[in-house]
Design a protein with these regions (language model features):
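Catalytic cores of Mg2+-dependent Asp-rich isoprenoid enzymes
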Residues: 2-288, 293, 297-432
């Protein structure tokens, strides 16, 4: 009979986990049936489902359930349910409530992104908000203090959560950059976050509004699970790495936390040309490279350096200089120019995505690309000064960019698009 701790060890191997020779031999001898048993033990609480009576009561009260609390805080409308799933499809009223929750979360946490969703058809806007809410929650777990509800549990004291935590505590040499308590908390929550993701690809429905809305989204737009798993893996990277030796290492990180989001988005936008996937990957790389440069000053205060270390060394730039802001010297500005030049190679590919998308959905990615292009230009204009103040767009810049994007990608007849491109090259129109 399997030990209580073994299922988590089998189904969720950890980086750098300490194993004995006997453990290795035992794992190699595990049969398919043993793996099934392990899975059953791990997910046993997930068989609990909200009763039909409770579901009907929720359906009747859905129009009265609020998602904003007395102190204007965002409230999970299903937080008092003591079961993790609905075994049957919940009423449409509850799914609509879940989408409302995701939309409110997006408006609160990412006004610029929400603006870019503004002109999408309702179904696609809802889907984009569900995807954003998933990404936001994963990031909040890895990089913030979000306390997620564990499925089939009463939180941290759930037997399976306790068993998993004990298993983690028994492992040695994790190589995490966090203190032990923070690491155990975050890796446990990300594990259960993956469990919730599983409901989106099964016959049950999560009582977490984010995953209820996400399930409807992945079903409607046939989005594969791999991109969501990759994003969670990117969040896990932040628990182990706070330095990247080379651009190749940084690229993998950027792909996991940003490119996969672009790949999710294009399934919602719609496309036929397979090149759209390559350009969506470049779109994510461009945006994340811009984020990395913009946030250098803030990241170094959190003991994180995302810029490739080999490139900093080659340019005579040291970490202490980044932290003390004395890096604003003759080495830093040329490095920033080279960095921006490489980011723009991905920007050029990202822009090739736009003509491959339907006109009705093109504004959304075009606006995001234009905003980040402007941020990168502003960094260059400030000679790479990302230390003394955060680089961001003011309201006038946002409005003017949004108007230009709207005009080009929603109003301008297609046959005039080359004319806009030509005038943008000589500076008579914005390059959006």
């Amino acid at each position: 009979m399997l030990e209580r701790r073994k299922p988590l060890d089998l189904l969720f191997p950890l980086k750098g986990s300490a194993t004995t020779r006997e453990d290795g031999e035992e794992r190699q001898s595990m049969t398919a049936l043993d793996h099934v048993r392990a899975g059953v033990m791990l997910a046993r609480d997930a068989v609990k489902a909200v009763s039909v009576t409770a579901m009907e009561a929720l359906r009747e009260g859905a129009t009265f359930i609020g998602i904003v609390g007395e102190k204007n805080e965002l409230v999970d409308p299903f937080e008092h349910l003591d079961a993790p799933i609905w075994s049957d499809r919940p009423p449409q009223e509850l799914t609509k409530l879940a989408f409302r929750y995701c939309e409110e979360l997006t408006m609160r946490e990412a006004g610029n992104f929400y603006h870019s969703f503004k002109y999408l058809p309702d179904e696609q806007r809802n889907a984009m908000c569900a995807v954003y809410a998933f990404c936001r929650r994963a990031d909040d777990i890895a990089d913030g203090d979000w306390a997620d509800r564990f499925p089939g549990s009463q939180g941290e004291m759930d037997p399976e959560a306790v068993a998993y935590r004990e298993q983690l505590e028994s492992l040695q040499d994790q190589g995490t950059i966090l203190d032990e308590e923070a690491y155990l908390n975050k890796i446990t929550q990300l594990f259960f976050f993956r469990k919730k993701l599983s409901t989106c690809y099964s016959e049950v429905y999560s009582t977490d509004p984010v995953f209820l809305a996400l399930k409807e989204t992945v079903d409607r737009y046939s989005i594969g699970r791999e991109v969501f798993d990759d994003l969670i893996s990117g969040m896990e990277d932040d628990l182990y790495n706070n330095r990247y030796r080379s651009f190749d290492e940084l690229y993998v990180y950027c792909y996991r936390v940003a490119s996969v989001v672009g790949l999710m988005c294009i399934e919602i936008y719609g496309y036929e040309d397979p090149r759209a996937k390559k350009f969506a990957e470049s779109w994510g790389i461009f945006m994340q490279l811009t984020n990395v440069l913009r946030d250098v000053g803030e990241d170094i205060q959190r003991d994180r350096v995302y810029l490739p270390l080999d490139e900093l060394e080659a340019n005579g730039i040291t970490e202490p200089e980044l932290g003390e802001q004395v890096v604003l010297n003759k080495q830093w500005e040329p490095y920033c120019r080279d960095y921006a030049r490489r980011a723009r190679t991905y920007l050029a590919e990202a822009r090739q995505l736009l003509p491959l998308l339907p006109r009705r959905t093109r504004y959304s990615p075009a606006a995001m690309i234009a905003f980040y292009d402007k941020i990168l230009r502003q960094i260059e204009k400030q000679q790479g000064d990302v230390f003394t103040k955060r680089v961001k767009l003011n309201k006038v810049q946002k409005i003017s960019l949004a108007a230009a994007v709207y005009m080009r990608h929603r109003l301008l007849p297609a046959f005039l698009d080359p004319l806009w491109t030509g005038l943008a090259r000589i500076g008579l129109l914005p390059a959006v």
